[in-house]
Amino acid sequence: VQGAVTEHSLTMAGADRAESAVVLGSQQIEDLQGRDAKSLMNSLTIKQYNPDIYVCTQLFDSSSLTNAELSRADEIVVVGALAGGLLSRAALDHGSSRAISSLVRTEEQGVIYRVSVPVSWVGRSFGALLEEAKTQSNILLVGIESSAGDLVLNPPGDCTLGELHMVAVIANQRPQL
């Protein structure tokens, strides 16, 4: 839905029963901080309308992160920081931007997914599960997220998975573990 985020537009969009919402910055607002402020206000409006909806918000300026918590958005993606990081990686490791970019484009093979740790993996080491996950499910384990939300990419092989952990995997489709 484009345009103003109002109770009427949220009702028309079905936000009362939606699982997720994505808030994109308005290209009509040239000032990046103004654009981000509008996005954060829209996020807050959506959360007030439906507190259970998962809101992902696009920001353009990392300095806007200081106000992001007020918006109650569940996830914030700072586009400027992503582009800057991608460019710096490409300058340091020629060609790496193709691999990184392909992981976030859904039309590509091999997308990053965040999935719950299966019961059969609880108490086992990350290293022991690498080959098993690849051979049995054709997925590549790349990280572990703790119950506190801390993400560790490429953790040590002896890192043990717990029942409240999530794993970051690369797969051709969402794995059913």
Regions found by a protein language model. Give the residues of each.
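Cytosolic regulatory regions of ion transport systems
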Residues: V1-L177
